[in-house]
Amino acid sequence: MSMPRRPVIRIQVRYSGRVQGVGFRATCAWIAQTVVDSADPITGWVRNEADGDVTLEAQGSPAAVEGFLKEVGERLARNIVSAVRAGMAVVEGERGFGIRR
């Protein structure tokens, strides 16, 4: 008998403020790779935008994604002026969390 699949969500967040040139993307990747519970991993990516914003997409269980985004918001609060969230389609087979250029 196969195990039931856990629910998976994907959230995109566009951050504005002083979010480029301050280690924002590296901190997001570090949180995803080391702070989040390895039994409930986060996948996705983070990248700089031409207008000075940073876009992040995070995928995983609802609890993992919300915990990850909370950690990002707390650790980088001094840099974030606004964060606009949107639900996205789940990317099947995605592995890892990376920095896109």
Regions found by a protein language model. Give the residues of each.
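Intrinsically disordered, low-complexity, mixed-charge
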Residues: 1-101
